[in-house]
């Protein structure tokens, strides 16, 4: 592969491009991961993070001393002003060549926020505690997200508004199945239903009524969620909430036909259509895209199979005496590729029931 001062070169039929990637030639990630796992306290952990060998990933920290910490871990280039950095920039000059990075200490981060919790769901770091004034901000040219995902909104509604959270409440919130009324899927539903108020088509009316009365729950027994999942998630562009009502109507017609032809009704329980599949097991799942119980699906014949979202989950707590307890779950089991192993799918039943096993 050819190289330029900016990085590797790609020659395509519409042009020749050089790609510059943060940390491309940095081999310190292994050292950083090692030091993070060997850290005995917050100071050692933060020193490991300052290596900046790992160029990405939101990072959270907690310890037996009661400390919690969040950092928007990123190797962000110090870019020169005057260029549209969200677009393709000229490659025939070195004047736009960046060689330095934002220092670790300047990244958005916070230790022990007043609210007593941290969260980030691939959303803006500035609202990781629910209070934008608590976390230092950087200029817009850094490219840091400013949007809130549905999971982040719901996380702040649940964890952020509860001043005293028990273990059971913590897990209940993590497995929450309900979309916020402020989520994009809720806003899209409401906007589309309002747009279709004047439509009296008998073909669509039943489907529209089902969507309008949907309580935003993605419990496996919910009878409106299946239609909602088939119609709404791809109906909008997250960055601007713009959508074409005609394309939504087309998707609604297709989804009504699919459910009626395969299940005889459009108000089929979600878990009959959207499932966890492992070997011969087919298990009804609660949860969906953009929820704290995150599940993303792919169509396979007449069913939609979970392919992404929640996977390995670990829950750790320290008692007043500093004693640690931990629980975990994997959507399948510890032998992810060995179909002959008893551990190929032995955790699937616990996973779909939203239970965890204690680590001993």
Locate the predicted segments by residue:
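C-terminal/peripheral segments of proteins
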Residues: 1-194, 200, 204-360
């Amino acid at each position: 592969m050819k190289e330029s001062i900016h990085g590797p070169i790609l020659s395509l039929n519409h042009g020749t491009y050089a790609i510059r990637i943060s940390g491309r030639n940095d081999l310190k990630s292994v050292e950083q991961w090692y030091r993070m796992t060997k850290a005995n306290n917050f100071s050692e952990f933060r020193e490991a993070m300052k290596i900046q060998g790992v160029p990405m990933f939101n990072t959270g920290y907690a310890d037996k001393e009661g400390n919690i910490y969040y950092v928007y871990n990123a190797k962000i280039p110090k870019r020169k002003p005057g260029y549209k950095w969200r677009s393709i920039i000229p490659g025939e000059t070195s004047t736009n060549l960046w060689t330095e990075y934002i220092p670790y200490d300047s990244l958005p981060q916070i230790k022990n926020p007043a609210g007593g919790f941290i969260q980030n769901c691939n959303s803006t770091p500035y609202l990781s505690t629910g209070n934008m004034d608590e976390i230092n901000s950087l200029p817009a040219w850094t490219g840091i997200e400013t949007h809130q995902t549905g999971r982040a909104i719901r996380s702040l509604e649940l964890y952020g508004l509860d001043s005293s959270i028990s273990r059971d409440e913590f897990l209940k919130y993590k497995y929450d199945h309900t979309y916020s009324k402020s989520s994009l899927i809720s806003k899209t539903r409401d906007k589309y239903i309002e747009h279709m108020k004047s439509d009296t088509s008998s073909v669509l009316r039943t489907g529209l009524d089902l969507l309008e009365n949907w309580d935003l729950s993605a419990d496996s027994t919910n009878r409106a969620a299946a239609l909602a999942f088939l119609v709404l998630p791809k109906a909008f562009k997250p960055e601007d909430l713009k959508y074409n009502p005609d394309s939504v109507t087309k998707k609604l017609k297709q989804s009504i036909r699919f459910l009626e032809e395969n299940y005889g009704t459009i108000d089929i329980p979600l878990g009959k259509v959207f499932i966890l599949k492992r070997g011969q097991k087919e298990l009804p799942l609660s949860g969906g895209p953009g929820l704290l119980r995150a599940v993303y699906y792919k169509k396979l014949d007449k069913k939609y199979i979970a392919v992404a979202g929640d996977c390995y989950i670990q829950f750790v707590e320290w008692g007043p005496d500093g004693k640690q307890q931990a629980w975990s779950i994997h959507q399948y089991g510890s032998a992810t590729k060995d179909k002959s192993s008893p551990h190929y799918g032995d955790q699937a039943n616990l996973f779909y029931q939203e239970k965890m096993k204690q680590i001993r």
